[in-house]
Amino acid sequence: MKIVVAKNIGFCFGVERAIRTVEELLDEGKKVVTDGEIVHNKQVMEQLTKKGLKVSSEMTDGEVFVVRAHGIPKDRLEELKKIFPEVVDLTCPIVSQLFKTAQRYAKERKVIVFGKEDHPEMVALRGYAPAIVTKVPFKLEEKKVVFLSQTTSSLEEYKEFVAAMIRMNEFEEAVFLNTICPVTVNREREVEELSKICDLSIVVGGKHSSNTGKLFRIASKHSKTIWIESPDELPADVVKYGTVCVFSGTSTPNSLIENVVRKLKEMEGKRDGTI
């Protein structure tokens, strides 16, 4: 079995920044509170809660409230500043830029965002600008529009959505902006190419992670593909595949990927009788 690990793996800079900041606050002995997953990764959240991070939508007792990487609505942010002595905004810079862009364009045209309506990033965005969030093309009366995208969406799927919207409607002015995170686009392209030479693709990441799900869908077009959160989920028959490729979402730590590779080698060793 040949194991090929993608070059673009591990945390993106926004996730790394968020986790590092929370760990530093906890190491200082501060009572740190948040209202959901800092990042969409179960193992990372378990580690942070063990260190003392409190997660609750109702919690008001704490010294520091940390805003998740996905962001929160503007009015909610202002409320939190009145409740907590310190609020640390860990919204990813690329996500923050999306919010500002939507807010700016909403003054002059209808904002249409390609994304999952219930995703935390999209919930937060609607707190900055009145926007239609959907992945399904539809008819619209407005003639002036701007197209934006959730930062973790597939670029190709986004382009297809915009093309369908333009075919279905008679817009006088339609602005198309690529607001997808370049880190996720690079991973998307690597998975698109590398999965073509794989007998099995393994995508490692949280089951609630949009960007991980995107990589899973792309790899599935070209090879047998599985989506796992931990090495324990590797199937026993993984050793039957000749070339196994390992990919990861942007909320997946390098340590977890290393553990998956280690487990694969152990399974191969047991099959060959070398362990």
Curated annotation (Swiss-Prot):
Enzyme class, UniProt record, top EC level: oxidoreductase
Gene3D superfamilies: 3.40.50.11270, 4-hydroxy-3-methylbut-2-enyl diphosphate reductase, catalytic domain
Entry keyword annotation includes Iron: yes
Binding-site residues, dimethylallyl diphosphate: H40, H70, H119, S209, S210, N211, S251
Catalyzed reaction equations: isopentenyl diphosphate + 2 oxidized [2Fe-2S]-[ferredoxin] + H2O = (2E)-4-hydroxy-3-methylbut-2-enyl diphosphate + 2 reduced [2Fe-2S]-[ferredoxin] + 2 H(+); dimethylallyl diphosphate + 2 oxidized [2Fe-2S]-[ferredoxin] + H2O = (2E)-4-hydroxy-3-methylbut-2-enyl diphosphate + 2 reduced [2Fe-2S]-[ferredoxin] + 2 H(+)
Residues that bind isopentenyl diphosphate: H40, H70, H119, S209, S210, N211, S251
Cofactor(s) demanded: [4Fe-4S] cluster
One of the record's GO cellular component terms: cytosol
Known EC number: 1.17.7.4
Active site: E121 (proton donor)
Metabolic or biological pathway: Isoprenoid biosynthesis; dimethylallyl diphosphate biosynthesis; dimethylallyl diphosphate from (2E)-4-hydroxy-3-methylbutenyl diphosphate: step 1/1; Isoprenoid biosynthesis; isopentenyl diphosphate biosynthesis via DXP pathway; isopentenyl diphosphate from 1-deoxy-D-xylulose 5-phosphate: step 6/6
Pfam family, one: LYTB
PANTHER family linked to this entry: 4-HYDROXY-3-METHYLBUT-2-ENYL DIPHOSPHATE REDUCTASE (PTHR30426:SF0)
Family statement: Belongs to the IspH family.
Function field: Catalyzes the conversion of 1-hydroxy-2-methyl-2-(E)-butenyl 4-diphosphate (HMBPP) into a mixture of isopentenyl diphosphate (IPP) and dimethylallyl diphosphate (DMAPP). Acts in the terminal step of the DOXP/MEP pathway for isoprenoid precursor biosynthesis.
Protein name: 4-hydroxy-3-methylbut-2-enyl diphosphate reductase
Taxonomic source organism: Thermotoga maritima (strain ATCC 43589 / DSM 3109 / JCM 10099 / NBRC 100826 / MSB8)
Lineage of source species: Bacteria, Thermotogati, Thermotogota, Thermotogae, Thermotogales
